[in-house]
Amino acid sequence: MSFTPTDYNAYDFANRRHIGPSPSEMEEMLRVVGVSSLDQLIEETVPASIRQETPLDWAPLAEHELLARMREVAAKNRVMTSLIGQGYYGTVTPPAIQRNILENPAWYTAYTPYQPEIAQGRLEALLNYQTMVADLTGLPVANASLLDEATAAAEAMTMAERASKSKARAFFVDADCHPQTISVIRTRAEPLGIEVIVGHPAQLVPEDVFGALFQYPGTYGLVRDFTRDIAALHEAKALAVVATDLLALCLLKEPGAMGADIAIGSSQRFGVPMGYGGPHAAFMSCKDDLKRSMPGRLVGVSVDARGNKAYRLALQTREQHIRREKATSNVCTAQALLAVMASFYAVFHGPRGLRAIAERVHLNTVRLATALKEAGARVSPEAFFDTITVEVGVGQAGILAAARHRGINLRKVGRDRVGISLDETTDAGVIARVLDAFGIHEPAPAKVGLGFPEPLLRETGYLSHPVFQMNRAESEMMRYMRRLSDRDLALDRAMIPLGSCTMKLNAAAEMMPITWPEFGTLHPFAPADQAAGYHEAIGDLAQRLCRITGYDAMSMQPNSGAQGEYAGLLTILAYHRARGDAERTICLIPVSAHGTNPASAQMAGMKVVVVKSAPNGDVDLEDFRDKAAAAGDRLAACMITYPSTHGVFEETVREVCRITHEHGGQVYIDGANMNAMVGLVQPGAIGGDVSHLNLHKTFAIPHGGGGPGMGPIGVKAHLAPYLPGHPEVTGPLTGGHDEAADEGPVSAAPYGSASILLISWAYCLMMGGEGLTQATRVAILNANYIAARLRGAYKVLFMGNRGRVAHECILDTRPFAEAGVTVDDIAKRLIDNGFHAPTMSWPVPGTLMVEPTESETKAEIDRFVAALLAIREEIRAVEEGEIAAADSPLRHAPHTVEDLVADWDRKYPREQGCFPPGSFRVDKYWPPVGRVDNAWGDRNLVCTCPPVESYSIAAQ
């Protein structure tokens, strides 16, 4: 027998690892769809008039080649000890948390917990986070995270404006706030017509403002009591916001004790690496009467169908996708995974451990300050926690350079001062090197006292709930983390077919580099020459994204898709202002648009005009034409999603763009559905002027159970000068364009959550241009295969002119309402089959939107189809009168182990209820709770850890 080498490429990441169906399976699927080839399907799906002609042509890297390239790039970053502070600090990530949370797909591949029955684990972890924040800030209600401290401050400003009874239109900002926070607040305030007054608290005139923001401790270190300032604000019917530090609050008097209405900050130093700017979970807490005005997601306690304790997202009618143009915030993706990490850091250390860390950080700072003073240095402030500034006069540059020579970054403050912020990684050796940079060779004193007045010492306890007391041993921590993850359904268990969410594979090789210290320990404001590796990676990713989208420049700053929308609209408005067209403020948005679109437009100060949908789901072209003409020289932009939110490539997209440009507007193409376009259609080539990209959808960043995400924006060349800038960076922040942007920032850090950009870069490098295009084609195949398999059982609501859907399809479940079966019933019944429900009731109420992505195998898709077909038969039984809807397995879903072992008095067999067709028997996923009562949870709102008795009841 002669030897013939195989043509099988074992290292073909795109086709062997990322794309689910094999070539032979694709042939079967194409037959079901009714086409002879993938090329024919694409021709029938994507209009020829918009298809790109130039293919993406870079070669792919194998996984081992990718990791070698990453090592080379990582080596170009210089790992220094950064004592710059300014909201970013060195921290120790406990290996138990890194291994069991950050590196665990059970945690990082989950979706936002809108289906509470399959998200009890991460909901409990987020409730722990809320409890931690509420306890430490001394305020009763906290949310489940925001994007970063600066945007949290901006959200707090608009929240204060809504809630304040003052008629003033100005907001006071303490000059001791972090510079990036002040800049982001100015960016947010300008389009809303809010005047920002920056000054010393002594200059505050409470009657002139609706609210004020104080930094505690201040950016230059000052710790002071704001009780009197806050009382004066309240006397004038204004609200007080305190930006604070959770570690400092383990020692310092809490904002709630000062009378603060809102507290915000970052939980980064609770075990989350700096990552050159992120991702990190910001927090917000508030007084009870403000909770309904709070942005972001809020976890609450409710009960299930059997009366057992259950967690859920509370007060969801506050959210942007429901309120749309009436929304007060566009927060969607936040930072759930990082909030979970921070909550486990608190569980890991407990209150005594956190206080010990805070004491060590503070006393080390006192030692350093004392040594500097004894050597004759002028150190301020008198009261501090972990940050001091030293007056050095003309010697500033020399001291900064001497510190860098010793491996330490200090902060340049003005022209003649140096800032020093210590953290939990600071030891005696670091202090000695700092002193050496100042020419001081005497050791710091061993015994010192408090560095702030005793009245500022915290008097109240915190983290008294047993969850923060019971898990000291790592074995117990590991088991607690495992118990919580076992309660959830993430991509490591099953397909998550959420329409418009693109729950694709997050490959292990893509994830690995983010935990490397060469990427994790960099401070976002470190000298640029220390981040050469980051700049190479970010620049290369930006260039590739420009090639993919057809845009000329790419800003990597926005921290989420919604923030990308906001940044893109601000860019458009800045462009119009520069041309003398400041009156252009109208934004045309189709009624079917993503909920964040009108919310973002409202935040940007635009007037939203809603455009109708035609009967086939497309934008109503006549209505669009009429409203564009009516807007005339006041038209700023239109926002469209492509392919449409109805899952179709609309033939008229070029005409929509032409009409908008004809009236002087700019075209914003929402990139949420880019997974149907990569390699096939470039939004910048079909008339788009700006788009955001959801890197946590199309480009493989995991959803993390509700964040992190990234939403960079691509623009045509004429908009590039108006992209977001940053106060800490000079020079260009964009890829593909050499001009420095001078508009205000939208995020705290110059490149947003820079460390997770590495995931998308790795994805692009391993897939290669051809692999990225094939992924798009297979995503379209998988969606059309599902539509074909379900035809006859469910009506597919919208299709293109040739009967095809894009990368997702909408199943119409409204006809079943006549029999009393709801879309909720179908969603919960899918849990019994081990599936997360598709997107419910959006963009059309009473429907399910299904997006399988290219990563799902034919076997998994067939299992999902079998589940839906079995559910259709159960609906048919209700329709034909065999069983009432209220008595059916649909209404009792999901079924728990408690249901399985209880006395069975239901009108369908136990086997049918608990083991429906398509479900696994050996490895079956059992939801920990039955159907959750949402209304009960909102009527009886509890947003911190419930009493310990409820845990023991649940255990029994």
Swiss-Prot record:
What top-tier enzyme class does this entry carry?
Answer: oxidoreductase
- One example GO MF annotation: glycine dehydrogenase (decarboxylating) activity
Gene name of this polypeptide: gcvP
Q: Does the keyword Hydrolase apply?
A: no
Taxonomic lineage = Bacteria, Pseudomonadati, Pseudomonadota, Alphaproteobacteria, Rhodobacterales
In UniProt terms, what function does this protein have? Answer: The glycine cleavage system catalyzes the degradation of glycine. The P protein binds the alpha-amino group of glycine through its pyridoxal phosphate cofactor; CO(2) is released and the remaining methylamine moiety is then transferred to the lipoamide cofactor of the H protein.
User: What is the protein name given in its UniProt record?
Assistant: Glycine dehydrogenase (decarboxylating)
Q: Name one GO cellular component term.
A: glycine cleavage complex
Which residues carry the post-translational modification N6-(pyridoxal phosphate)lysine, per the record?
Answer: 697
Q: Which GO terms describe its biological process?
A: glycine decarboxylation via glycine cleavage system
